[in-house]
Each structure stands twice: as C-alpha cells, then as structure tokens.
Design a protein with these regions (language model features):
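Secretory targeting and sorting signals
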Residues: 2-28
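Feature marking well-ordered beta-strand scaffolds used for ligand recognition
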Residues: 29-491
Length: 491
C-alpha cells in the first residue's frame, strides 16, 4: 500500500525563517570551506588521501565463533575478492548468529522496532540510500518501509511511506516510542529542503497516519527526538544549521529555536532532554556537548551554550552518538562514518566507533574503541581495495551506525560496518570492548553498483527473542538472532 502521494511543498525557507529568532549563542565554529568540501567530496568520491600513516587504536579483539558459525577468513571484517570467485561469499559469514527472517533487497540508514498500544510489533526502515541516484541501484521502490513483525520469521510489508521527507529521509528517520511518532526531514543531495513529515504510529503501527508535512527543517540530513517526544531536532551538513521543532501537537509543529552556529551530523539527547550530544563536523570534527535546557523548558528566546568539545586522532566523519549508563557511569557510544580521505588508502584513517566517558561533561574522554582488523592501515596497504565494494567511495571497509538494546547497562552494541556487515560488541567493560558476533551477507553483483555488503543502518533490538534487526542497502531487511552466549545473560 502506498500512503499519501508525493507532492510538492511550495513554502520556501524564507517563509520558514520569517518571524523566527535566529540564535547567536556561542558554540563550535562554523563548518569551514575545507571541512565542507572534504565531507561532500567523501560522499561524492573525490576526497584526497592523507599522507603518512595515521595513528589509530588497535583493532577490537575478534569474536570466538561457536557451533553453527560460518566465520570469515584470517582478517577480521574482510570479504576478499577470491571468496566471490569460489562462491564462498554468496553463502555469507556468520559468527554466533543466524538469520531468522528476511525481506526486500535494499535498505537505508535507520531501522526501528516498535510496539503500538494494541501490542502489535512493527519494523520501520528507510529504503533510499541516496535519492534519486539510488533509483538505478535499487530494484525496489524508495520510501520508508513498514513491516508487520507479528511473526519475526516472516516479515510482511503493510505500507510504504512516500511523502516528501519519507521518500528521501537520508539519515533523518526518527522514532519516538513514548508518543508513537515517526518523523523525518528530507535530506541530500546536499542536502535538500528540510521538509519534515510526522506520522502517528501509536494506534496501528502497520498503517501510519500522516499528521503534517511542513518545511520547518529548513535544510535536512539527520535528526534526533527528545526522549519525551516533544522536540524534534533537525540538522544539516550543507553548512551550519540546527533546528529545534516543537511537535507537542504533531499536526501543527513549530520552530522553537534555530542556530547557524553549529554544524552537526547526527545528535542525541540525555534522558531529560537538557543535553544534546552532537556529532560535530566543524573545523574540529568530533563531539560537542550542548546545554539545551532552555529549549526543552520552552523558555522565551532560549539560549543554548556549549559545555565541551572533544576530538580524537583517527576522527573521520562523526556520525552520531548514543548516551548510555554502564555500572552507574555515563558514557556515549560515538561512531564515525567512512574514512578520513579515500576509501582504501592506508594513509586515510577509518574513524570506526568508540566509548566516551561523560561523567564530567566538561571533560569527556575516550575509554575504548570498536574497530576491525580490516580498518587498520596495515590491512588497507594490502590488496583489499580489490574486494567488491571496498573502493566504492560511499561504501568501503568502515563503520556507519550503532544501536543498543537499552540505555542502562546495555552490555552489547550492534554496529553496521558497511562491507563488513553487522558487528556486535560487548561493552560491559567500556575500557575494553570485545567483538562477540557478526553477520554479513554480501550481495551478488546483479544490478548496477550492487556488489558486496552495504550495511549502513542503525540496528534495533528484539530483546525477547535475542535478535538484532538491521537493513543492508544491497540485500534488504534482516532479523538476526545471536547465539552461543553472544546475547548477554540478564538482558
């Protein structure tokens, strides 16, 4: 079923900005021309490699694969060209994991699990990697796919959302489970008018109900909900710009704050919505923590202030953050996308993922890392650039998104590592993460550009069934069960 035919939104950015106060609070420097060029060129495939050997952390210890596994070869995360020649790659690679359910042949950047007020369980995932260029790449229609997951082994598509933002949400698809709101801000190429669509999924998640379509995002790309579901934050990577939208009434949303002082990729908020953890793409890429309490309280003329900023030597393109608490201590799971330069050069550092302690929010620090052997300069100096998907500028051996089963003592984190598939790490000790499972189903080269795995989406979790849900841009939606002790006891 196709919901709400595609339509043109006539209101322009000037209309949105009319009467809206533009904040001028001090914050991270605006995105420099060099940084913007680097970011856009990395997506377009023309970034120049760095020189020298970058300083990177050690690879995370490999998973110990138990019975029923079909493990990789010697290099953690690699699917070599030879495996395609022998037919090994088409069988997939599993370690302490197995496929429970599968549907579709394409995927995007976000995957969500949701239980509505009647107890129905649904999945939502976007299927548009980059509109309109992905139309030639995919053999499925774009938009946000809605699945009935009553039987996790047999997903059933019940709707496809194709309103403007849902047709091309890029990385902005967001779900607030408390209120049952599904939203997106239209994004990319670089990065589209920020048309915002809001749906109510609380009554029957199989059939979302459109609440509004407005141009309030100004420019889109990424997003984040406050935990109470009253504020939708939209960010753009086409220069600085962050917008806070009041969605208390999703039929009549309104801008409550906007600033050109920050250039964020993704962002997340703490439990009370007063702290924003931004993946900063400014002149010093990394993490920026903002005090947004006045926005959350709906103060008149709210002021947002910067609390701290952190970067790390191997930073590439900071993607997003997840606030978690582990044994009473506060951390962020932070993940970078791609590499700092070209997809394959050993001189271009792969950002991968990390744990950041924020007990003292004024002095955050990195405690541990999640990265694979295939991400390391030594591996990139070999012939891995010949592996299918490795040299494609917006694919490659790198990280993209992560997800956790819960925010308090999550124990594990699942991350999409693009050509290396879905990787699962134990973070019970955030100073020493270790890999415990992986699942990688490379796609055969049957369509233009389709080659290798394209695991890009933020995963979600089916805790009851010890499963992880994610979408691969080349092979669709997957429901993967963890086995052999990879799923932690007590979770």
């Amino acid at each position: 079923m196709i919901l709400s035919p595609r339509r043109t939104v006539a209101l322009g950015v000037a209309t949105v900005l009319a009467g809206v106060g533009i904040a001028s609070a001090a914050g991270s420097p605006s995105l420099s021309a060099e940084a913007l060029s680097g970011y856009l060129s990395s997506h377009a495939g023309s970034a120049k490699a760095a020189t020298g050997t970058p300083k990177v952390p050690a690879a995370t210890p490999k998973a110990d694969c138990g019975p029923g596994s079909h493990p990789e070869g010697a290099v953690q995360g690699r699917v070599p060209l030879a495996d395609y020649a022998t037919g090994r790659a088409v069988k997939g690679y599993t370690c302490n994991s197995g496929a429970v359910g599968h549907i579709g042949s394409t995927g995007g950047f976000k995957t969500f699990r949701y239980t509505d007020r009647t107890g129905r369980v649904c999945a939502f995932y976007d299927g548009t990697l980059l509109f309109p260029t992905s139309l030639a790449h995919d053999n499925e229609a774009p938009g946000v796919h809605v699945l009935d997951m009553s039987d996790p082994a047999r997903p059933v598509q019940t709707a496809r959302l194709v309103t403007p933002a849902m047709d091309s949400p890029h990385e902005s698809l967001a779900l607030n489970p408390l209120r049952g709101l599904l939203a997106a801000g239209m994004g990319s190429p670089a990065t589209a008018p920020g048309v915002v669509d809001i749906y109510d999924v609380s009554q029957d998640c199989r059939h979302p109900v459109l609440q509004s379509t407005t141009p309030l995002g100004i420019l889109g790309h990424e997003s984040g909900f406050s935990p109470d579901g009253r504020t939708l934050w939209i960010s753009t990577t086409a220069g600085p710009g962050v917008t806070a939208i009041d969605v208390s009434n999703p039929v009549l949303p309104s801008i409550v704050w906007h600033s050109f002082n920050y250039t964020f990729h993704g962002m997340n908020l703490n439990a009370d919505g007063t702290r924003l953890y931004g993946a900063d793409l400014g002149s010093s890429p990394g993490l920026t923590i903002l005090d947004v309490s006045q926005v959350q309280k709906r103060d008149a003329n709210p002021v947002v202030t910067q609390i701290s900023h952190l970067t790390w030597p191997e930073v590439s393109i900071p993607q997003n953050t997840i606030p978690v608490t582990i044994k009473g201590h506060k951390y962020l799971v932070e993940f970078d996308e791609y590499s700092k330069g070209t997809s394959t050069s050993p001189s271009s550092a792969v950002g991968a993922a990390r744990m950041i302690n924020i007990d003292n929010e004024k002095k955050p620090f990195v405690t541990g890392n999640m990265r694979l052997q295939v991400n390391q300069p030594a591996a990139r100096a070999t012939d891995e650039s010949k592996d299918p998907g490795a040299a494609y500028p917006v694919q490659g051996y790198a990280a993209h998104y992560c997800g956790v089963p819960r925010t308090v003592d999550p124990t594990i984190v699942a991350c999409s590592f693009i050509v290396s598939g879905l990787r699962v790490f134990n973070i019970a000790d955030p100073y020493h993460p270790r890999e415990v499972a992986y699942f990688n189903m490379p796609a055969p080269n049957t369509l233009p550009l389709k080659s290798g795995a394209y695991a890009m989406s933020a995963p979600s979790f089916d805790v009851k069934n010890h499963s992880v849900w994610y979408a691969d841009g080349d092979s669709g939606f997957w429901n993967v069960r963890l086995m052999n002790g990879a799923w932690p006891k007590g979770l």
